[in-house]
Regions:
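Short catalytic micro-motifs in class I SAM-dependent methyltransferases
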Residues: 125, 129
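A conserved beta-strand element that flanks and buttresses the S-adenosyl-L-methionine
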Residues: 122
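Class I (Rossmann-like) S-adenosyl-L-methionine-dependent methyltransferase catalytic domain
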Residues: 1-58, 62-116, 130-217
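Conserved acidic residues
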Residues: 119
């Protein structure tokens, strides 16, 4: 297994970096199941009658447990994007009925907003994996990929780390970043994190700034 001390933040921009982590089994971010806060959010969407044809993106999805759960609930337009091929192949084996065309081995930052527009983008350990110098690019790309009434929803680490991924942060940093591009509907301590992450996660819901009186779920 690769020694974490040998990893540099400059490597995270390369597909080979992430492929090697999967090849070596160095996937400490993978909890082996749907993240409970995101499962609860998906169930909230179902309870509120959100269309199962909603366009949903999960970037940097890895083994994509959330995408699998959405698929099981009948959502038909879920897209998974990851740098690495292996987790996408594994996902396809676990969910043979999932549309192969929706499994994208690609650079999130290279997705064309003219081709892809989403109602929901779900953040789960992608933001903390990118080079911190690209966080503004992340926010800009999210803004471009979301429909006017779209939502960016997910989890952020409320904790600082060393120079290797995961790259953490805190609520104030995230507010400063995201309020430039979005209306912050929710950014609060997560009450239903898995035990190892309790007290170190923030749950958030962001919407496009120009939309007034939009739904907040």
């Amino acid at each position: 297994m690769e020694d974490n001390n040998t990893l540099t933040e400059h490597s995270v921009n390369d597909a080979e970096f992430w492929q090697k982590r999967y090849d070596d089994g160095y996937t400490g971010w993978d909890i082996g199941k749907v993240s409970p806060p995101l499962q609860a959010y998906i169930e909230h969407l179902l309870d509120n009658g959100v269309s199962k044809s909603a366009q949903i993106l999960i970037p940097g999805a890895g083994n994509a447990y959330e995408a699998g759960y959405l698929h099981e609930q009948g959502f038909s337009h879920v897209y998974v994007v990851d740098f690495a091929r292996l987790p996408l192949d594994n996902f396809a084996k676990r969910y043979p009925s999932f549309p192969k065309a929706h499994l994208l081995q690609a650079d999130f930052f290279g997705l064309d907003p003219a081709q892809y527009q989403f109602d929901y983008i779900i953040e789960q350990t992608f933001f903390c994996a990118i080079d911190p110098s690209r966080r503004s690019d992340y926010a800009k790309q999210m803004q471009k990929l979301l429909k006017p009434t779209g939502k960016l929803v997910g989890l952020l680490l409320d904790k600082h780390f060393e120079s290797n991924p995961p790259f953490g942060g805190d609520k104030q940093e995230y507010e400063t970043l995201f309020q430039q591009f979005f209306t912050i509907n929710t950014l609060a301590p997560c009450y239903n994190s898995i035990k190892p992450r309790q007290g170190s996660e923030l749950f958030f819901i962001l919407s496009q700034k120009k939309v007034q009186n939009a739904r907040v779920f």
